[in-house]
Amino acid sequence: MKKIYLIAAFVLSVFTLSAQNLRTGYFLDGYSYRYQFNPAFQGERGFIALPVINGISFGAESTLAVKDFLYPTSSGKLGTFLHPEVSDAEVMKNLGQRTMLNTNLDMNLLAFGFRAKKTYHTLDVSLKGNVNATLPGDIFRFMKVGASDGNAVYDLANLSLSSDVYAQVAYGFSRRFLDMFNVGIRLKALMGVASARTNVRNLSVSMNSDQWMVSADGSASFSSIYQTLMSGEEDILNEAMAKLKSPDLGFAVDLGVSVDLFKYLTLSASIVDLGAIGWKNSSIYTLANDPWVYNGFDISASGEGTDNIEDQLNAKLDELAGLFNFEGLTPQQVKKNRQKLAMTMHVGLEARLPFYERLSAGLLATHRFNGSHSWTEGRFSVNWALLRWFSLAANYAISDFGHSFGGALNLHPKGFSVFLGTDSFRPFTSFSPNMIPLNDLNTNLVFGVNFPFGKYNGRFPKKIKEPKKDKKSKKDKD
């Protein structure tokens, strides 16, 4: 089980750095990373993006809000939802439905793009990661109420947790045809770092004050580049070298197309992350649907104040972990475990004003294919290329995580480009007196710098002034 705890700690460290692509940038003029949404998109110039400064970002997508967990108490302090002054009914009103939490890490380590006639090429190295959780509503009732009412039965089925971290090297190619079609492909070589997945199909808990009767059916798998190291105790160095010579590899592809239906109307579509990683060493735990008795333990935390919040939640999570009974299981060691990536589909439609092409309206539909963690979003965007080197975007989105307002600005003259944007301002629009965000934890903030180079090949080239006719030469001609 040391393997599980080490990988879990690694996954949690990734969670604190999590971020996601800036979907507000899909229609943003001059945004260098549009090709990551659709490989058919071509940059207005070539660019170089260096480590650290090329993108600093953080965020999460969730149906939860901080106010669902922290409540004011009679002492004037904030208490968790476990506090005795917080009623069961109030907690269930806020946390009684299925909860989704998705975070994505997309850390560009190095990126490069350049143009060659009608083609555009990109090459980048990045670290990718996903942390996803789907929790049944009864899980919070279990944590809040427990067996305080005497006998209680909880249905914790369809609980799903997953995390994948991998390194990626990608090459992208886009070609323009007939001055109206752009077709693109992006090839990705992947190397797995860590993967942890838990899928509980059935979990029923019957509780009383003395013991819990648990019945569970599900599985958990753990894969990591550290898997061999943690199992080898005699010669760690040789184990490490052997593992590095035989890494967990994978392959993925992005496909995209963009079509100018009319002069002022563009349709685009793409499929991103179509592929998988093959893990060479995995530990798979299977829970049989046989009932067992779990004695649990008592928690003395009062739920008041923010200093002991971590202790309270850790204690409750320890109780939940005990329900899975993984400690008593012998894992099945699998040498080949192929896991698909979470695939994403984008469909966009952009309309420009005939009398002012610098102003456009865009519709973007996004769907994430990821099993129980799948989600869908529709986003309406207004985009303004105020100058050839300065652009703005504002948008409104509706998704499985609720509704949100986003915006971005992009300063992109030749030689230097800086961008700042967010897909949702909502968490920053409402705060408690303790400066706790009250709205849904559904946001991201992206800031970065890169260095454009080469001839401008964007939508707004400089107009060539016609030379004035020489009046004298005209008279001589007459």
Q: Where in the sequence are the language-model features?
A:
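Subset of outer-membrane beta-barrel
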Residues: 20-478
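Bacterial Sec-dependent N-terminal signal peptides
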Residues: 1-23
